[in-house]
Amino acid sequence: EVNQVLSELKQDYKIAILSNSEPDIIRFNIAKIGVAFDEVVLASEAKCYKPSAGMFNELIKRLNECPKNITHIAQSFYHDMRTAKDLGFGRRIWINRYKKQGDLSYKPDAEISDMRRLHEHL
């Protein structure tokens, strides 16, 4: 479902990757997905790892957007939802495939089990 949903999103939105993964892994995954991302921010470039605000600030800078205009969509509650909220991202959508428990004080704007329901929350 990931490839299809990202292709659809790309028609109307800028899309970016914010990842702690190694560059070779990300390049492989991007090629497999087959979607042109507007930005790719890696920990190796930002010189820090999520959940560090440095990663998110690098994304904000590259997108040239105010945080309130950014929707952050992620699978990791710990690595993504807290920092996105602390930095004032406009919307935070948690893809909770495994029905994990998140921190209620950092409750996302939406919680979905897979990306097919993403359009309902944008």
What positions do the PLM features span?
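Catalytic-core regions built around general acid/base machinery
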Residues: 1-12
